[in-house]
Amino acid sequence: MGKYGEIQSGFMEERTRILDALDLPENKHITLRLIGALAFRTHCPKYGYFQDALGRVFTDIDFAGYSKQYKDIVRLLTELGYEEDKMVTRLFGDFRLVLHEDKFGRHIDVFLDKLDFCHVLPLKGRLEVDKPTIPLAELVIEKMQIVQINEKDIIDTIMVFREHRVGDTDKEFINGKLISKLTSDDWGLWRTLTGNLTLVESYLTKYPQLTDEDRRVVTENINELRTWIDAAPKSLKWKSRAVIGEKKKWYKDVEALEDRT
């Protein structure tokens, strides 16, 4: 048995083991926040069952952290029974770590300082805002910035919009003020995010497991976020890029290694 007990077979149980280790005095200085499906489940205790009801399965455990704590992050996850993928570190170590465990064949992704997928989402100064996940605004953007979005991402987004209202704060709210600030300076992010909000809304009638009240609340919150986004003054950079529109590619393609969240 390792320092923090045995690796657990269930994703939720393994998540808890890692979070418990982070709460110990020797690790409290490490800023490591859940992202991905497990983060949505953690932040949606009331409606987390949506993932099960709609067929959403867990495939890995993902975190966000700070590059300045790279050594401490690797040390902790190694003590938890994971082994650093040195090749990934050599290729992407300034913003990405991958660690593996052999018992159940799982891996942990750790994204450092930013989420860099179809669009870049900076995280510096934001990881301290919430715990044990990244803030709700970043959870929404994490999914809504994916150009080739999957159904699993749509399910996660429906769930978070059912559980949490949109407002101008981070505490148990989806921070529409912050999201609108980011989309008002980046036309590409605005284009992808607003398009995906419409797609999420269109999926609400697909799932008979959802009640009319579920659909009403999710639609209401999507519309509230749209109101924030539409009302935010757009930067000169945004306006200049909007003139070009979709004639020029507005997003980055995501490599297979990065498409795991």
Where are these regions (language model features)?
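Catalytic cores of NTP-dependent nucleotidyl/adenyl transfer enzymes across multiple folds
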Residues: 112-261
